[in-house]
Amino acid sequence: MKQLVTAALLLTLTLFNNTLFSQPLEWQSRGIGGGGALFAPSVNPINDAEMYIGCDMTEVFHTTNSGLSWNTVGFNELLSVTTSKVQFTSDNLIRYAVNFDFFTEASFPVKSTDGGNTWSPITDPTGGECYAIFADDNSTQRVVIASYNRIYFSSNGGTTFTNIYTNMGSGAAHVGGVFFDGTNIYI
């Protein structure tokens, strides 16, 4: 019996000893990944080395070196919404996005005036149901936002919005994209 206990102890020590040395000495980043799906990439038209991409785990990832390294935008500044991406404008400091509030479960439009370092809410005519935002990359003032049954337009950087479309039926105001062409806007 004593030999059996000794053999079991030696076997156990051998197995645990091997696992101690099988761990990597250091971790290496292999790119972005939030533990979930990544979606809605956006590339800065003024500086194509700068990009944002959202994750369904609420992180927003940001790179300024063409993806060689990524940082997470602070969760107290911007949380990812699966149908929204960061929108760039003609001024590299002014950007728009849709933010999410876990406590109220509201999705609302936000604006950055410092190149994405901080984000502040703008007027939200959707009452917390904003699912998409589109900004004119040749202007800082023209913004389109969509809820599930309405589409709104702002000509003053989100200070005020005008309802430009309402679907009271099935709630089908899904916007797949917006094309700004001078004074014309195609939705």
Kindly give the residue locations of the regions a language model identified.
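Bacterial Sec-dependent N-terminal signal peptides
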Residues: 1-24
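Extracellular glycan-interacting surfaces
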Residues: 22-187
